[in-house]
Amino acid sequence: MNQEDSVVYVVDDDPSLRGAIDSLLRSVGWRVQTFVSAQDFLDSKPQDRQACLVLDVALPGLSGLDLQSELIKNKIQIPVIFITGHADVPTSVRAMKAGALEFLTKPFEEEDLLEAIRHAIEHDRTSREQHRDHQEELAAAARIQQGLMAVTALQPPFAEALGKSQPCREIGGDFFSVLTVGDSVVAAIADVSGKGVAAAVMASLLQGMIHEGLLSNVPLPEIARNANEFFSVRDLGSKYATLVIVCVKPDGQGEYLNCGHIPPFVARASGEVTRLRESNLPVGLMRNAEYRRSGFRLNCGDRLILVTDGVTEAESPEGDFFGEERLEAFVSLGMSLDQIFTSVCLFQDGRPLSDDCTLLGLDYVGTGARF
């Protein structure tokens, strides 16, 4: 291992021991930073780099165990080697359960400390490599997921579609699809319960099932029944999905299937906003559920907006929800998807999204895209 790329932090209020450890570590090539107290260490705001922490248990003010708790709370991942003059079992157990790598009792042999530090630095190096690999895999999965949602299929001349999806983690359980089937345009949006990788796996599978069903001209209720049966009979940890599939023909006649999802918004060219409110059970929630489609009509200049609950349940710092009424008001003003998404972010006062956030719009015979 390259000692120049690593640093050993030492926190001990005993100046003689602190100095002795500092001299020992420097004599064998380690970079060292010493601190008198736990608070001094926190105030230094240690850099995110390969390191380990040699920490006295009994410190004035914040104890060593208190500092360990603060590091965990602030998601600062530094391997900890505790040193103490009184190694009682409860303290040792608490420290090790919280992730300490070693617990040395004073007086300890120099080689024991050096070996513990070598082990801690190697542990940190390995952990960082694994974290980088994991992040790279998630980034690749995110690119694939976004690619699956890209509106790249040839769209018919009577409609224009645009979608936007932002997961609250690297990948998420929302998706949208737009494709041409025969002379019709089909738009779908779905939200799998939960977040992260597990939801993303189910979302990708569901998206593929819907896509295949549509291209095979399977009726919308049968697509939902097939998906519901597939997910209901498997042990998926209580996962289910809400979704909407909308099919629009060149003359504006349409049909839709809603499975427990937020009712779509229809912004009429006149300025009125209506909702497609007929609904069914979510897929994967109850085996043998029945599904029915409903009809509607779009006129020239009408716009269809579909969203997931990451939009309507976005929360302000005061604990208020963005809500369907607020969204309906913005839709009535003709706001674009980007403007609506920006409004959601502003409503949350710039805080990270708490849920996956997806919007899908479909313009029927517009003079140009309004997204």
What positions do the PLM features span?
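Acidic catalytic/metal-coordinating carboxylates
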Residues: 36-37, 63-66, 87
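Two-component/phosphorelay signaling modules centered on CheY-like receiver
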Residues: 2-6, 14-33
